[in-house]
Design a protein with these regions (language model features):
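RNA pseudouridine synthases
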Residues: 1-194, 218, 298-306
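Pseudouridine synthases involved in rRNA/tRNA modification
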Residues: 1-34, 66, 84-86, 204-207, ...
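Short, well-ordered beta-strand segments enriched in hydrophobic/aromatic residues
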Residues: 96, 225-229
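Histidine- and/or cysteine-centered catalytic micro-motif in compact active-site loops
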Residues: 149, 174-176, 216-218, 228-230, ...
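Short aromatic-glycine motifs in intrinsically disordered, low-complexity regions
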Residues: 195-204
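Long C-terminal interaction/binding lobes of large macromolecular proteins
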Residues: 213
Length: 311
Protein backbone atom coordinates (compact mmCIF):
# COMPACT_ATOMS: atom_id res chain seq x y z
CA UNK A 1 0.00 0.00 0.00
CA UNK A 2 1.34 3.42 -0.95
CA UNK A 3 2.29 6.02 1.65
CA UNK A 4 1.18 9.65 1.37
CA UNK A 5 3.44 12.32 2.84
CA UNK A 6 2.51 15.99 3.21
CA UNK A 7 5.44 18.37 2.70
CA UNK A 8 6.00 20.91 5.48
CA UNK A 9 8.61 23.64 5.89
CA UNK A 10 11.23 21.05 6.85
CA UNK A 11 11.46 19.88 3.22
CA UNK A 12 10.31 23.02 1.40
CA UNK A 13 12.51 23.52 -1.66
CA UNK A 14 14.15 20.08 -1.46
CA UNK A 15 14.60 17.96 -4.58
CA UNK A 16 12.28 14.99 -4.83
CA UNK A 17 15.12 12.47 -5.20
CA UNK A 18 16.94 13.78 -2.12
CA UNK A 19 13.69 13.72 -0.15
CA UNK A 20 13.09 10.08 -1.07
CA UNK A 21 16.68 9.05 -0.37
CA UNK A 22 16.47 10.53 3.14
CA UNK A 23 13.21 8.69 3.88
CA UNK A 24 13.80 5.36 2.16
CA UNK A 25 16.76 4.01 4.09
CA UNK A 26 18.04 0.72 2.70
CA UNK A 27 16.43 1.16 -0.72
CA UNK A 28 19.01 1.08 -3.57
CA UNK A 29 19.34 4.39 -5.42
CA UNK A 30 18.65 2.63 -8.72
CA UNK A 31 15.29 1.44 -7.38
CA UNK A 32 14.35 4.91 -6.15
CA UNK A 33 15.14 6.54 -9.49
CA UNK A 34 13.31 3.78 -11.37
CA UNK A 35 10.22 4.38 -9.24
CA UNK A 36 10.35 8.07 -10.16
CA UNK A 37 10.85 7.39 -13.89
CA UNK A 38 7.98 4.89 -14.03
CA UNK A 39 5.59 7.22 -12.25
CA UNK A 40 5.29 5.04 -9.15
CA UNK A 41 6.15 8.15 -7.17
CA UNK A 42 3.66 10.98 -7.64
CA UNK A 43 3.53 14.57 -6.43
CA UNK A 44 0.00 15.95 -6.20
CA UNK A 45 -1.14 12.93 -8.29
CA UNK A 46 1.20 13.87 -11.15
CA UNK A 47 4.32 12.28 -12.59
CA UNK A 48 7.39 14.43 -11.99
CA UNK A 49 11.13 14.33 -12.59
CA UNK A 50 13.73 13.50 -9.96
CA UNK A 51 14.89 17.14 -9.84
CA UNK A 52 11.39 18.43 -9.04
CA UNK A 53 11.49 20.91 -6.13
CA UNK A 54 8.95 20.21 -3.40
CA UNK A 55 6.93 23.01 -1.82
CA UNK A 56 4.87 23.30 1.36
CA UNK A 57 1.54 21.55 0.93
CA UNK A 58 2.68 19.10 -1.76
CA UNK A 59 1.39 15.55 -1.33
CA UNK A 60 3.96 12.89 -2.22
CA UNK A 61 2.82 9.33 -2.93
CA UNK A 62 5.50 6.74 -2.19
CA UNK A 63 4.91 3.15 -3.37
CA UNK A 64 5.76 0.15 -1.18
CA UNK A 65 9.42 -0.65 -1.83
CA UNK A 66 11.27 -3.59 -0.33
CA UNK A 67 14.08 -2.53 1.96
CA UNK A 68 17.37 -4.39 1.77
CA UNK A 69 20.58 -4.25 3.72
CA UNK A 70 19.15 -2.11 6.51
CA UNK A 71 21.73 -1.91 9.27
CA UNK A 72 20.38 -1.95 12.80
CA UNK A 73 22.42 0.15 15.18
CA UNK A 74 23.24 -1.20 18.59
CA UNK A 75 22.10 0.91 21.55
CA UNK A 76 24.46 3.72 22.43
CA UNK A 77 26.48 3.45 25.58
CA UNK A 78 24.57 5.37 28.27
CA UNK A 79 27.68 7.25 29.35
CA UNK A 80 28.11 8.62 25.81
CA UNK A 81 24.47 9.72 25.70
CA UNK A 82 24.86 11.52 29.03
CA UNK A 83 28.10 13.11 27.85
CA UNK A 84 26.55 14.37 24.61
CA UNK A 85 23.55 15.77 26.49
CA UNK A 86 25.87 17.74 28.75
CA UNK A 87 27.81 19.07 25.75
CA UNK A 88 24.81 20.70 24.07
CA UNK A 89 25.54 24.42 24.20
CA UNK A 90 22.35 25.79 22.65
CA UNK A 91 19.14 24.33 21.26
CA UNK A 92 15.98 25.63 19.60
CA UNK A 93 13.22 24.02 17.55
CA UNK A 94 15.20 24.16 14.30
CA UNK A 95 18.84 23.88 15.39
CA UNK A 96 21.28 22.85 18.05
CA UNK A 97 24.92 23.63 18.76
CA UNK A 98 27.04 21.00 20.47
CA UNK A 99 30.57 21.00 21.82
CA UNK A 100 31.73 17.98 19.84
CA UNK A 101 34.20 15.79 21.73
CA UNK A 102 37.50 14.93 20.09
CA UNK A 103 37.65 11.40 18.69
CA UNK A 104 34.00 11.24 17.62
CA UNK A 105 33.28 11.45 13.89
CA UNK A 106 30.43 13.68 12.77
CA UNK A 107 29.05 10.85 10.60
CA UNK A 108 29.30 7.07 10.63
CA UNK A 109 30.89 5.30 7.68
CA UNK A 110 34.31 4.11 6.46
CA UNK A 111 34.47 1.49 9.20
CA UNK A 112 32.90 3.75 11.84
CA UNK A 113 29.64 2.30 13.14
CA UNK A 114 28.09 5.53 14.30
CA UNK A 115 28.93 9.23 14.38
CA UNK A 116 27.63 12.28 16.19
CA UNK A 117 24.62 12.79 13.91
CA UNK A 118 23.47 9.19 14.32
CA UNK A 119 23.83 9.53 18.09
CA UNK A 120 21.79 12.74 18.15
CA UNK A 121 19.06 11.09 16.07
CA UNK A 122 18.82 8.36 18.70
CA UNK A 123 18.65 11.03 21.40
CA UNK A 124 15.45 12.30 19.77
CA UNK A 125 14.22 9.57 17.38
CA UNK A 126 11.64 11.80 15.67
CA UNK A 127 14.36 14.13 14.39
CA UNK A 128 15.32 12.16 11.30
CA UNK A 129 16.23 15.26 9.31
CA UNK A 130 19.26 16.32 11.36
CA UNK A 131 21.87 17.77 9.02
CA UNK A 132 25.33 19.21 9.59
CA UNK A 133 25.61 22.91 8.80
CA UNK A 134 29.40 22.51 8.67
CA UNK A 135 31.92 19.83 9.56
CA UNK A 136 34.67 19.21 12.09
CA UNK A 137 37.42 16.64 11.70
CA UNK A 138 37.17 13.58 13.92
CA UNK A 139 40.00 14.71 16.21
CA UNK A 140 38.78 18.34 16.40
CA UNK A 141 36.60 19.39 19.33
CA UNK A 142 34.27 22.34 19.79
CA UNK A 143 31.26 24.17 18.32
CA UNK A 144 29.30 22.24 15.72
CA UNK A 145 25.98 23.53 14.35
CA UNK A 146 23.28 21.02 13.44
CA UNK A 147 20.09 21.96 11.57
CA UNK A 148 16.80 20.25 12.38
CA UNK A 149 14.96 21.78 9.43
CA UNK A 150 16.03 21.98 5.81
CA UNK A 151 14.94 25.63 5.56
CA UNK A 152 17.45 26.58 8.24
CA UNK A 153 20.14 24.43 6.63
CA UNK A 154 19.68 26.29 3.34
CA UNK A 155 19.74 29.68 5.10
CA UNK A 156 22.95 28.96 7.01
CA UNK A 157 24.64 27.43 3.96
CA UNK A 158 23.89 30.68 2.12
CA UNK A 159 25.55 32.65 4.93
CA UNK A 160 28.61 30.41 4.76
CA UNK A 161 28.86 30.93 1.00
CA UNK A 162 28.60 34.69 1.51
CA UNK A 163 31.29 34.57 4.22
CA UNK A 164 28.86 35.93 6.80
CA UNK A 165 29.57 33.28 9.43
CA UNK A 166 32.45 33.95 11.83
CA UNK A 167 34.14 30.73 12.98
CA UNK A 168 36.88 30.98 15.59
CA UNK A 169 39.36 28.18 16.29
CA UNK A 170 42.10 27.80 18.89
CA UNK A 171 45.21 25.84 17.95
CA UNK A 172 48.71 25.24 19.26
CA UNK A 173 51.38 25.32 16.57
CA UNK A 174 55.06 24.50 16.36
CA UNK A 175 57.58 27.31 16.87
CA UNK A 176 57.32 31.04 17.49
CA UNK A 177 54.90 32.81 15.14
CA UNK A 178 56.74 35.83 13.77
CA UNK A 179 54.23 37.58 11.51
CA UNK A 180 51.57 38.88 13.88
CA UNK A 181 48.09 38.80 12.34
CA UNK A 182 48.27 37.24 8.87
CA UNK A 183 45.88 36.26 6.12
CA UNK A 184 46.74 33.13 4.17
CA UNK A 185 45.39 32.72 0.64
CA UNK A 186 46.46 29.34 -0.68
CA UNK A 187 44.48 27.00 -2.97
CA UNK A 188 43.90 23.47 -1.69
CA UNK A 189 43.47 20.24 -3.63
CA UNK A 190 42.46 16.79 -2.45
CA UNK A 191 44.84 13.95 -3.32
CA UNK A 192 44.94 10.19 -2.82
CA UNK A 193 48.31 8.65 -1.99
CA UNK A 194 49.47 5.26 -3.27
CA UNK A 195 48.46 3.62 -0.01
CA UNK A 196 44.93 4.98 -0.42
CA UNK A 197 45.26 7.69 2.21
CA UNK A 198 43.36 10.88 1.43
CA UNK A 199 45.32 14.07 1.91
CA UNK A 200 44.98 17.77 1.08
CA UNK A 201 47.84 19.81 -0.36
CA UNK A 202 48.46 23.41 -1.35
CA UNK A 203 48.17 23.31 -5.14
CA UNK A 204 47.69 26.07 -7.72
CA UNK A 205 45.09 23.91 -9.48
CA UNK A 206 43.03 23.53 -6.31
CA UNK A 207 40.19 25.58 -4.87
CA UNK A 208 41.07 28.90 -3.25
CA UNK A 209 41.06 28.89 0.55
CA UNK A 210 41.53 31.78 2.97
CA UNK A 211 42.41 31.67 6.66
CA UNK A 212 43.14 34.48 9.12
CA UNK A 213 45.76 33.64 11.77
CA UNK A 214 46.57 35.63 14.90
CA UNK A 215 49.04 34.72 17.68
CA UNK A 216 47.70 34.78 21.24
CA UNK A 217 50.33 33.35 23.62
CA UNK A 218 53.93 32.28 23.02
CA UNK A 219 55.43 29.28 24.83
CA UNK A 220 58.86 27.69 24.49
CA UNK A 221 58.85 26.00 21.08
CA UNK A 222 55.12 26.64 20.43
CA UNK A 223 52.46 29.33 20.00
CA UNK A 224 48.77 29.39 20.88
CA UNK A 225 46.91 30.81 17.88
CA UNK A 226 43.47 31.92 16.80
CA UNK A 227 42.35 30.96 13.30
CA UNK A 228 39.32 32.18 11.38
CA UNK A 229 38.65 30.32 8.13
CA UNK A 230 36.85 32.43 5.55
CA UNK A 231 36.29 29.40 3.34
CA UNK A 232 35.35 25.86 4.31
CA UNK A 233 37.82 23.54 2.60
CA UNK A 234 38.67 20.12 4.01
CA UNK A 235 41.52 20.28 6.58
CA UNK A 236 41.97 23.96 5.68
CA UNK A 237 43.41 25.28 8.95
CA UNK A 238 45.68 22.27 9.39
CA UNK A 239 47.12 22.48 5.87
CA UNK A 240 47.54 26.27 5.91
CA UNK A 241 49.33 26.16 9.27
CA UNK A 242 51.69 23.45 8.04
CA UNK A 243 52.20 25.36 4.77
CA UNK A 244 53.58 28.29 6.77
CA UNK A 245 55.98 26.04 8.67
CA UNK A 246 53.87 25.99 11.84
CA UNK A 247 52.06 22.63 11.90
CA UNK A 248 49.49 22.01 14.61
CA UNK A 249 50.59 20.04 17.66
CA UNK A 250 49.36 16.46 17.58
CA UNK A 251 48.49 16.50 13.87
CA UNK A 252 49.40 13.01 12.66
CA UNK A 253 48.55 13.73 9.02
CA UNK A 254 50.12 17.17 8.40
CA UNK A 255 52.25 17.68 11.49
CA UNK A 256 55.92 17.39 12.42
CA UNK A 257 56.70 13.94 13.82
CA UNK A 258 59.49 15.10 16.13
CA UNK A 259 57.43 18.01 17.49
CA UNK A 260 54.42 15.73 17.97
CA UNK A 261 56.54 13.24 19.87
CA UNK A 262 57.87 16.01 22.14
CA UNK A 263 54.36 17.33 22.80
CA UNK A 264 53.13 13.82 23.57
CA UNK A 265 55.94 13.34 26.08
CA UNK A 266 54.78 16.55 27.76
CA UNK A 267 51.22 15.23 28.02
CA UNK A 268 49.37 16.19 24.82
CA UNK A 269 47.32 13.18 23.76
CA UNK A 270 45.55 14.50 20.65
CA UNK A 271 45.29 17.16 17.95
CA UNK A 272 45.30 20.64 19.50
CA UNK A 273 42.54 22.16 17.38
CA UNK A 274 39.31 23.43 18.94
CA UNK A 275 36.29 25.18 17.43
CA UNK A 276 35.96 27.89 20.08
CA UNK A 277 33.06 29.95 18.76
CA UNK A 278 30.63 30.72 15.97
CA UNK A 279 28.68 33.90 15.20
CA UNK A 280 26.15 34.68 12.46
CA UNK A 281 23.08 36.83 11.83
CA UNK A 282 20.17 36.16 9.47
CA UNK A 283 16.66 37.58 9.23
CA UNK A 284 15.90 38.76 12.77
CA UNK A 285 18.04 36.12 14.46
CA UNK A 286 21.52 36.06 15.96
CA UNK A 287 23.47 32.91 16.77
CA UNK A 288 26.52 33.40 18.95
CA UNK A 289 27.94 30.41 20.82
CA UNK A 290 31.28 29.73 22.49
CA UNK A 291 32.80 26.44 23.60
CA UNK A 292 35.47 26.48 26.29
CA UNK A 293 38.59 24.42 25.75
CA UNK A 294 38.20 20.82 26.82
CA UNK A 295 39.83 20.04 30.14
CA UNK A 296 42.74 18.11 28.60
CA UNK A 297 43.77 21.03 26.36
CA UNK A 298 43.27 23.59 29.14
CA UNK A 299 45.46 21.61 31.53
CA UNK A 300 48.13 21.20 28.87
CA UNK A 301 48.34 24.97 28.37
CA UNK A 302 48.61 25.46 32.13
CA UNK A 303 51.43 22.92 32.17
CA UNK A 304 53.28 24.82 29.43
CA UNK A 305 52.82 28.07 31.36
CA UNK A 306 54.17 26.57 34.61
CA UNK A 307 57.04 24.96 32.74
CA UNK A 308 57.97 28.31 31.20
CA UNK A 309 57.93 30.10 34.57
CA UNK A 310 60.22 27.47 36.08
CA UNK A 311 62.79 27.60 33.29
Amino acid sequence: MSTLMLIDDTHDGQRLDNFLISHLKGIPLTRIYRAIRKGEVRVNKKRVNANCRLTIGDLVRIPPLRQTNVKKLLPLDKSLLVSLEMRILFEEADLLVINKPAGLSVHGGSGIDRGLIEALCLRQPKSQALKLVHRLDRETSGCLVVAKKRSLLVALHALLTQRKVVKQYLLLVKGHWKWGKRQVDAPLKKNILRNGERIVKVDETGKMATTLFQPLVSYPFSTLMEARPLTGRTHQIRVHAAHLGHPIAGDKKYGDKVFNREMKMLGLKRLFLHSAGILCRWDDRVLGVCALLDTDLFRFLNFLKRRESQS
